[in-house]
Amino acid sequence: MGFLWRTRSNEKKITPVLSWPESEPESEITIPPEFQCPISIDLMKDPVIISTGITYDRVSIETWINSGNKTCPVTNTVLTTFDQIPNHTIRKMIQGWCVEKGSPLIQRIPTPRVPLMPCEVYEISRKLSSATRRGDYEKCGVIIEKIKKLGDESEKNRKCVNENSVGWVLCDCFDKFSGDEKLTFMLNEILSLLTWMFPIGLEGISKLASATSFRCVAGLLKSTDDSVRQNAAFIMKEILSLDETRVHSFAVENGVAEALVKLIRDSVSSSSTKSSLIAIYQMVLQKPEIASEFLEIGLVSITVEMIVDAENSVCEKALAVLDAICETEHGREEVRKNALVMPLLVKKIAKVSELATRSSMSMILKLWKTGNTVAVEDAVRLGAFQKVLLVLQVGYGEETKEKATELLKMMNTQMKLMSDCVDSLKEFKYIKKPF
């Protein structure tokens, strides 16, 4: 049956409205004002006291504070501290009242979990660090499982864990045991935790970028388990963000290119596709010679097909990858061969995002500067001139506008050449042309 909830100013009356008329209506249930949260005017499930002495439901007051408010909603007094103390007395009274009413409309509120405190996180971190130094992987596994459970309980717990440097300790633990194939499950659990702990700092990423750690992440990237591959792709993206030659050499040695392209081709998830594209972009940007490896496994055609109907965040990353590929001669040749490229580049200008617009214009410029005037003619015929003019009129950054200006000059020159060519054909306008 369905119910409608009617709210009055100082108290809340719950009046069930039955979904079929033949049933007898139940009696009204009035929530006592002292059990209502002053913010939501709803029954408090986790009552807490703030510095002004007023009791609120924890979720409501946290939302209020996280929105930037620094005063008590009731008294309008500036809060001296944002600490929230559980009001056990009110909670027990509410629980007793729920049981006393014994109505299906009112369920007994469960005893809320005590929020995670920084001192607890510090102790967890200390124990994990100690077990890692001793090489006690069993103890590490127990602590890792505890961190996982805490993170699953609430977003607030995750925030507390992130703010107390657990990420670095987990990276150290991963590096310590990354060479042991028997501990693959535990190592993947660490990567799974790290996906919600970034940024973890340069020191932590450096631990993951060691030779043994990198080899382990690359191995997990080739797993048959999609969730494992997704975690590994996210971590690989972060490792490759390091501007270090050795890291990109590790990528070549461990067959990372093929694993990333396979992950994109398999369409495991939007997040894994984005992580893979960012990782590929970083690899090609830092080590252009690796582009040939990506070209051999069909990256251009896969990326172009993706751009056709991908969501904006994926589309802009795919365009950035193609732009990086066009830095090499072999890459430009492969891009020219694909008939879809130029129509897509023109279409995405001023449509997806500034990054996508800049990447599209950059690719057209690269193709023209290397002697491909046909590409520019195609761009002009497809309406690129008008779209690039639009780029100069909207609020894009200086770098984007500079590319737009350069591209306009180039297209203007090409349009004049095309116009002269058309004029020279006027003398043949009376010659009958076969269909």
From Swiss-Prot:
Transmembrane segments: none annotated. GO terms for molecular function: ubiquitin protein ligase activity. Residues 30-104 form the U-box domain. Keywords: Repeat, Transferase, Ubl conjugation pathway. SMART domains: Ubox. Signal peptide: none annotated. It is an enzyme of class 2 (transferase). InterPro entries: ARM-like, ARM-type_fold, PUB22/23/24-like, RING-Ubox_PUB, Ubox_domain, Znf_RING/FYVE/PHD. One of its GO terms (biological process) is protein ubiquitination. ARM repeats lie at residues 202-241, 245-285, 288-327, 329-369. It comes from the Eukaryota. Pathway: Protein modification; protein ubiquitination. Its EC number is 2.3.2.27. It catalyses: S-ubiquitinyl-[E2 ubiquitin-conjugating enzyme]-L-cysteine + [acceptor protein]-L-lysine = [E2 ubiquitin-conjugating enzyme]-L-cysteine + N(6)-ubiquitinyl-[acceptor protein]-L-lysine. Functions as an E3 ubiquitin ligase. PANTHER family: U-BOX DOMAIN-CONTAINING PROTEIN 21, WDSAM1 PROTEIN. This is U-box domain-containing protein 21. It comes from Arabidopsis thaliana (Mouse-ear cress). The gene is PUB21.
